[in-house]
């Protein structure tokens, strides 16, 4: 699935995308040489969440055109799928995101806590949670 914005101000900013790279709508985005592309699990400086899908069939796929990105603030909450089984005990803990092929949205990996890019702030079901992004935003409660 995807990271779906549920509450907060949802500030959208335009960023130039990396040319010839697929991006899933609702995927976590990071910077690559000044352009945005899908984040990998090692990405700790995140740009936000993609609002638009970029596919190889798009007219601007091979160009570094701009796409809208929701830039998370301390108030923004996102619904996210998990890899593993979520429980109420996950609330308040920090986790990594998955690394997926470009064009496929990431999940929160409940077994991985190396990079800690999200904090679970609410339990929805065994397969979904609410999260806030850590990174370089105010909500982060770890040293950068």
PLM region descriptions:
Residues 1-144:
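Surface-exposed, low-hydrophobicity beta-strand/loop segments enriched in small/polar/acidic residues
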């Amino acid at each position: 699935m995807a990271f779906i914005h549920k509450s907060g101000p949802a500030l959208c900013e335009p960023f130039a995308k990396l040319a010839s790279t697929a991006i899933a709508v609702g995927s976590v985005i990071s910077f690559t040489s000044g352009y945005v592309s899908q984040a990998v699990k090692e990405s700790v400086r995140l740009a936000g969440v993609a609002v638009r899908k970029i596919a190889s069939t798009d007219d601007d796929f091979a160009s570094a055109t701009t796409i809208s990105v929701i830039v998370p603030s301390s108030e923004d909450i996102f619904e996210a799928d998990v890899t593993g089984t979520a429980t109420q005990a996950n609330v308040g803990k920090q986790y990594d995101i998955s690394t997926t092929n470009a064009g496929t949205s990431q999940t929160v990996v409940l077994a991985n806590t190396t990079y800690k890019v999200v904090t679970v702030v609410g339990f929805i079901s065994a397969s979904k949670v609410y999260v806030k992004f850590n990174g370089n935003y105010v909500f982060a409660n770890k040293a950068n």
